[in-house]
Amino acid sequence: LGETILLAPLVRPRAWGWSKLSYRLLSPFVDSIPRRFSENSSDPQFLDFLREHDPLQPRTLPTAWVGALTRWVPRIERAPRRALSPLVVQGESDETVDWRHGLKVLREKFDEPRILLLEEARHHLANESEGLRRRYFDFLS
């Protein structure tokens, strides 16, 4: 109780340089782009639900969202160091966030974060296979 827990934390998205360049080139001309769903969980039923049945999943990515990220990323990277030791769970197969960069930043921002790396886990840790969930629940408890 009272712990700070970060699951696949977003410091910056994967391929951030490309995304920023695309945003600068396209945002004056388009309001959104079609969304591409990625394989961000090893649970095929969850992935099917996201793609086909979840009414909260947008089919387009607003360029304003990428614009918000252009403000978020520098803000997080400039944030002052905190006297916290969060628990961090990160999948090494996560292709949504730039997790290597994120862990480097988190190590700079926090006092000795406790990090669990799961080699085969992807971004949607809460919707990963039961075995992966068990491993990080054991780490968190």
Role assignments for model-derived ranges:
Residues 4, 88, 115-116:
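Conserved beta-strand scaffold positions in the cores of enzyme catalytic domains, especially
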Residues 84, 98-108:
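Short alpha-helix in the alpha/beta-hydrolase fold that links the catalytic acid
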Residues 82, 88-94:
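Short beta-strand/loop motif that positions the catalytic acidic residue
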Residues 112-141:
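Catalytic active-site module of serine/aspartate enzymes centered on a nucleophile-bearing elbow/loop
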